[in-house]
Structures are given as C-alpha cells and as structure tokens.
Amino acid sequence: MHDKKVEEEILSLFNNEKTKKEGFTLLVNHFKKSIYFQIRRIVISHENTDDVVQEVFIKCWNKLNTFNGKSKLSTWIYRVAYNEAIQWIRKNKKEHHLNISEIQTEKQPTNNIFHKDAEEISILLEKAVLQLPEKQKITFQLKYFEDLTYKEIQLITGGSIGGLKANYHYAVTKIEKILSRD
C-alpha cells in the first residue's frame, strides 16, 4: 500500500473512537522498523533504543490527535522520535559515551578499503558516523540512511536547510577522512 494511503488510513482509523486502537496498531506496524533504526543510530544500544521507541509510540498515542496535517504523518512521527532520542541523550549524557568498541568487526581490518567486504565497510561506516558531532551525525543519518530530503530533515530537526547542507557536507568529509585512515 502506498505510504500516503497508509497515512490517510491511519489517521482516519485513529480519529474514530471505535477504530482508534486499530489505527494505532497500523501506525505501530507501519513505522516501528524505521523508527527503531532512526533512534538506534542516535542512541546506539538496543536496550535503550527499545525504551525510546516505546516512549515515541506512547507520545504518538497521546498526541496524534494534535497532528495538523501541515507535513506528512511520517515526518511528524520522525520528529517525535528525534526529539525523544535527543531528550534521552540529554537525560543520560553521563552514561551515554561514544563507545566504538560496541561495534565489533569479525575480521582483521585491511589497510585498503577496496579489499573489504560489504559487511566490513558497513561496520567501518557506523564507527565513522559515531565519531561525528551530534548535529552532523543526525543530519548524515537522516540524509544517507533514511534518504530524507533536506526539507524533511528541516521539519524533523528544526535546523535551516543551509545549515543541514553544511552539516551533511562536513559529515561526509570527516567520514571520508576516517575511512581513508582505516
């Protein structure tokens, strides 16, 4: 089913008291995977990600009736997820350390990126992204992994399009430097 149709169906079902639970179930089933991975890239650990995802869907249940339709429903939900992830990081700043060792490589790294398989490259990319400043990391993740437009990222993060483009450019440059060292 096309995303726009799904979003319309979710809102239609959710805004009717008799079908509200069905609409919410459809919302969760439709968005849980993408929301999980969006938050996981920010929060890192699986357990903490699960907690934040749960908070996102609780907030969606409580606030979906305030959705005004000025953006796509997916953009609104990504904004809720982004805000919850950032709130979790701020609340747990002392415990939330950049822990690159959490991402394990199974093979010994080689010095030439062209001799690495896709899994190794993916792990190296994840490690490189973890080393970015927060704004660059989030902008890169939303643009590269989620394939969102700058306008959609702006609606989620509240940043200016020019600032987002700069963050993405600096992120790509830093990632290239990091990957060329490995």
List the model feature ranges, each with a label:
Residues 66-68, 79-99:
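Arg/Lys-rich amphipathic alpha helix in sigma70-family domain 2
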